[in-house]
Amino acid sequence: MENEERGLAVRNATMVTSDIFGESKAKRLTSLDLRDEEQVDMFLNAQNDADFKLNDCAGKTLTIIGATIGEYPNETTNEETGEVIIRKKHSLCLFDEDGKSYVTGSGTCYYSFASIVALKGMPTKDAPLKLEVVKVPAEVKGHEYLKVKIAK
C-alpha cells in the first residue's frame, strides 16, 4: 500500500527550503514577499532570533502582515518495544505591521492559525489579519494552550 501525502492549498503562500542537497523532510511555507528585500530580511532575522515569544503576548491583538509555518519530523523510540515513532512537530512565526516577529512551537497555536488561513488565506501587507493571542485552559489543571483567533 502506498502512502499518499495530502496538503492544504493556501493562497498567498510560497514554499521555502534551505536544504541545498534535498534530503531534509522539513517543510516551510511563508506569505512574506521574498522578492522584497525588507521582507527577506524579516524572514532571515526571525529564523535566527525572533523578537518575541508568542506565549508572552497572550491578551494582545496583533496586525499580522506575514507568517512562516514549518513542519518537521520528530523521531522518538518506544523504550519498551524499540519501535521508532515519527511525529510531526510544527513552528509558527508571525510578522506584524512594524516588522516584529513572534514565534511559537505550540502545536495547538499552529493548528488554530492553520484553521484561520485555510479560509482566509495567509496574511500579507495587502491583506493583513488582525489576530488575538489567547490562552485557553486545558483539561489538565494548571495547564493552558496557546491559540490565535480573529480579533473583533
Language-model-derived ranges and their functions:
Residues 25, 106-108, 128:
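A composition-driven signal for long, intrinsically disordered, charge-rich low-complexity tracts
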Residues 123-125, 132-152:
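Short, charged beta-turn/beta-strand-edge "cap" motif at the junction between a beta-strand
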Residues 102-115:
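GIY-YIG-like beta-to-alpha core
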Residues 57, 112-132:
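Short nucleic-acid-contacting surface segments enriched for D/E, G, S/T with interspersed K/R
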Residues 1-99, 141-143, 150-152:
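OB-fold ssDNA-binding interfaces and closely related basic DNA-contact patches used
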